[in-house]
Amino acid sequence: MLGFLVLP
């Protein structure tokens, strides 16, 4: 869900 983090 978050492009700048590991989360999608």
Curated annotation (Swiss-Prot):
Post-translational modification remark: Processed by the macrocyclase-peptidase enzyme POPB to yield a cyclic octapeptide. POPB first removes 10 residues from the N-terminus. Conformational trapping of the remaining peptide forces the enzyme to release this intermediate rather than proceed to macrocyclization. The enzyme rebinds the remaining peptide in a different conformation and catalyzes macrocyclization of the N-terminal 8 residues.
GO molecular function terms attached to this record: toxin activity
- Tagged with keyword Phosphoprotein: no
The alphabetical list of record keywords is:
Toxin
Q: Does the keyword Transmembrane helix apply?
A: no
Pinpoint the Cyclopeptide (Met-Pro) cross-link. M1-P8
Q: Which residues cross the membrane?
A: none
Family, as annotated: Belongs to the MSDIN fungal toxin family.
* Described function: Cyclic octapeptide that belongs to the MSDIN-like toxin family responsible for a large number of food poisoning cases and deaths. Cycloaminide B is non-toxic to mammals but shows immunosuppressive activity, probably through the inhibition of the action of interleukin-1 and interleukin-2.
* Name of the molecule in the record: Cycloamanide C
Q: Give the organism, scientific name.
A: Amanita phalloides (Death cap)
The lineage is: Eukaryota, Fungi, Dikarya, Basidiomycota, Agaricomycotina
